[in-house]
Amino acid sequence: MGTYGNIPVGVFTGIPEINIPFFEVTAGNYTLPISASYHLANVRPFPTPGVLGLAWNLEAGGHITRTVRGFPDEKKDSQGHAYGFLEHHSEMNGISSRSSFVSALSTMFETFMDNTGHNEYELMSDEYSFCFCGHSGRFYLDESGNWVVVSDEDIKVLFSMSDNTVNLSQLEQSGRLSTVWWTNKSQNDRFITGFTLVTPDGCRYDFGGLEATEFSIPYYNRANSNLVATTWHLSKITTSEGREITLSYKYKGNNDRTLLMCDLRYSPQSMQYGYYNSNNGTMSDGAYQLNIGWNGFMGFLLFPSYLSVITTPNETVRLSYRPDATYANRLLQENYAIHALYWSETTVTASRFGDFIPANQFLMFMDGVNGDGTQTEIRQRIAARMSDMRLDTITVCSMRGGGWKKVITSFSNLARRHLTSLTFSDGFHSHHYSFKYNAGEMSYYYPMAATDSWGYSTGDSVIISETPTFQLVPSSQQALTRETLSEITYPTGGKTCFEYELNTYSKRASYSATHLISSNGVAGGLRVSRITNRRGDGSIDNIRRFFYCENISDSASTLAASSGVLSQLPMHTRNILSSDRNFLAIIKSKDAFSVPVTADDTPVVGYSSVIEQTIGSDGSSLGWVRRRFSNFDTDIYGQAHPDTQPVYRLVMSDSSQISPVTSLSYERGKITSEEFFDATGNLARKTCHRYGHTSGNAIPSIHHEESFYHTYGGMGTAYLQTGCMTSTHVRRYFETSVEDTVTTPSGRYSTKTSKTYKVSKLPKSVTVKGSDSKDRSEAYTYAYERAPTWGGAYTIMAEKHILTPLESVTRLVGSQTRDMETAAYSVTAGGVPYTSSCSLYQDSQRTIGKEHYKVLSTDGYGNPLEVVADSLVSLLAWSYQGQRLIARADNIPLGTAMQHVQWLTGLSSRDPVPSDYEAIIQLRASFPNALFHIYHYDGWLCPLSVTVPNGHTTYYKHDNWGRLLEEYYYDADGARHVLNQYDYHYAY
């Protein structure tokens, strides 16, 4: 079950990286882990907790999520007019100067001013973020219509308009959701339903399908809004050998109605605008609107889907859920939040910045909700129609009668449910994790929680009758600490305890992204300050303390000593002046305005220097480590890493300076040095890391905004347009060298490792220079690189995006080649690549050397059936869909496998039966000089027995979790002898 208590911390952000492994499911050599992770930054009022409770996330598969920029990329109306970037990306071609940029925006803007023919379009690609199975990144559509990926890996995006989109009729007929009473259908007639991503090992990951696609629509003004596909869950994994893992989802409740949720919050705003006299600073012929009360609510109606079944060649995983019985109640509060769900048109005529919100829009998409009766009755029906699901159990069943195992969850009864325990059981044994949280609660009613300027709880509830100050709301440590994870108790009885403190900073990035401002304060949530590990008897094992400064002695000083850099100070007011200085709009918001930046992973606060001190059980220091990171400020190599200004601008004067930038967040948060000090403060070791950019061109990203302001005094309507073109960097910032220096009483010893990379972001070379000053290097060539000249299997590998297999490794000492190891590849009849031979040479021209491994035949999965290794001929018998070797015979006559190829290939594609083992025994008798190993497996494909060439058999017993319980054998008289027994004792 792993090592308990060793909780890593992402010290650049101060966030503990907490993960509880559940189990792994497999398909051949592919492993899909299932676990629960906890993220401290997600302890906030919005949105509602996930299926594992507040701040916990179920890690099982993955997803692609979309940030819509302007129109959804695929937006198309029932008359066939496409609004989105998907069919207008070519409008960006030819933008090579500011004048051509302004011209492109002006042409586009004209379609907004005269939309009688519905000719509007946009120049902004949506942003698609993916996170699955250890892979993460983003992708965008570029001006050529290609999907461009921003990731540390070379990941390929596949999308087909015919296979990955549906129209409104198909969406309705599928039963995925009900569009009852929706009046904006004609403007929404195309929806993206999925993508396929291919990783460098050739694995294909399919996302979406209607059951695995989540949708959303603004909760208010639903009548005139777009229905948007926002999330595509992982639905199938296909390995390069053709094995599949399928993931199924549920989107309907027990009443066979589409599951609905809402994410509502109170976010009042105000707007004042009019014609501006720059001589005296006055406004005229304008208007003022304050959106408080009912008009201050914002949010979305959500159409979620939940992972229900995972099927592999070996296991079936079933996830069961139950509705949170108190969810509806937390959406209702008399006189306040209750009005966030519904109000009647006769009660209030609501409009927000000129958009009329009819009362009957509240029933759109609400199949099964009766609109008759009192307002209170209708609100209660709407609340009851919402469902917030929580995970109850995850059960894994073996496909081969190996039994079952499950994880059972327990939750608190607080307003925002907390995961309190995980029980692991297989019907015979069980063990538990338990979790405790800091005391106190956020507001019970979801829409009414008050937040600071970073979205964290202040501990109060909003008062909707008040006019906000629209100013910075500071963070409160007491409020932020409430409901945070304080303790994990492991199955052994040991514990890990967490203490937190507010994030601090001594510098902040300017809004223009050109420089840093000396300014200190607290901001943006919590960081871990201390982690205490306790033994089962409660005594302290060790303590880890974290200091976010340059020296431990600085930790007790003022905020100015903090190494934190604030990415931006939240801005609550925008003063927007037209370029001719004749029109002014002043917009204020309780929630801070966000800067539209693509490919941005900047934390609220990042730390340039963090010290981690370890304290032993006796309270004495065991030493500490100081880690430095690249950040906005200057790193140890004199290099700063700020964002950069837009390439082109067409903007109004914005005194708040909120403007898009080109993000360089991919350069920040890289560890630049680690210094290890002993208990007395002496430096024992120092490791320095340098980085460089990989190849890859930036893609242009346009941000534009069109604003229409209705004025008075006969002045008509003011039209304002703003836009910027920034760059989205595809290149990455990889480690190019590591210099490690160890200090001992006899002197210092240094080793330097240098690295280069391919265009595919795979390693190109690694060079190590030791204390003897000699370079020892390895240079790598990959099979896909041989495709243009060698064709055949290499072309197939390149086409399937199988990039990682090596074709050659050349080892050098200085400039002299020491040896070269090569691999050749072929493909099966079904197109599965496999290693067909390996050779070792003493020169780079491949003239001096020999082939030392050759595959003579394979099964359909590319597993070798007959190989020659250093003149030794071996036969290999595979089974269980090519996942397990059930027999190996060494020193057999050449061609033996070919004589039995039909049986061997058939055996590989199915599970073995007793007659298969009988055939192996007969084969062993036919070749008395051969050395046979025979393997049996249990229902979980764990080893059951191993028979070695002398006929001795060792037996193994595992539990359903794959833990070895016993090793034993039988003697010639049939007596059973135990070799080893293993007991797993847990405290509870």
Predicted regions and their residues:
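Short, solvent-exposed beta-strand-terminating loops
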Residues: 252-259, 324, 440-448, 886-900, ...
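Beta-propeller domains
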Residues: 303-305, 314-468, 480-483, 693-697, ...
